[in-house]
Amino acid sequence: MVEFRKTIPILRIFDVAKAKEFYAGFLGFAVDWEHHFEDNTPAYLQVSRAGLTLHLSEHHGDACPGSTVFVWMTGIEEFQREISGRGYQYLRPGIEATFYDARCVQVIDPFGNRIRFNEDLKAAPAT
């Protein structure tokens, strides 16, 4: 029997410090690990939060900048309040209604990658 367990998107980055500021400092992800083949070589790292895992790579062939990741989640209002309260100077995302009956918080990282965090209105408890 075929079973797909988990998808981990790989996003292209160009600066580890900026990536950590955005993913850990702004979005609240944990940096699980960081790998370099040698000193002064490109980084490959894993960040995660609440069941979502992302790989971030400075390696040229791993991914294209400007990718989009679509994420289903719950607690979108709390998430939006939390990240907006951090005062990240480059982004202040709101919650948008979508045509597919969801609420979406879209963020764009310093490298042009988009993450669309979505909460299904049909599955979300009434507020």
Give, region by region, the residue ranges found by the protein language model.
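N-terminal beta-strand motif that seeds the catalytic metal site of vicinal oxygen chelate
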Residues: 1-20, 32, 67-69, 119-127
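Core segments of cupin and vicinal oxygen chelate
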Residues: 10-53
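Short acidic/glycine-enriched loop/turn segments that link adjacent beta-strands
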Residues: 38-43, 63-65, 98-103
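Active-site beta-strand termini and strand-to-loop segments that position acidic
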Residues: 47-50, 107-110, 120
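Short, charged/polar surface micro-motifs in flexible loops or helix N-caps
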Residues: 50-54, 61-63, 75-78
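Conserved beta-strand in the GNAT
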Residues: 55-57, 106, 116
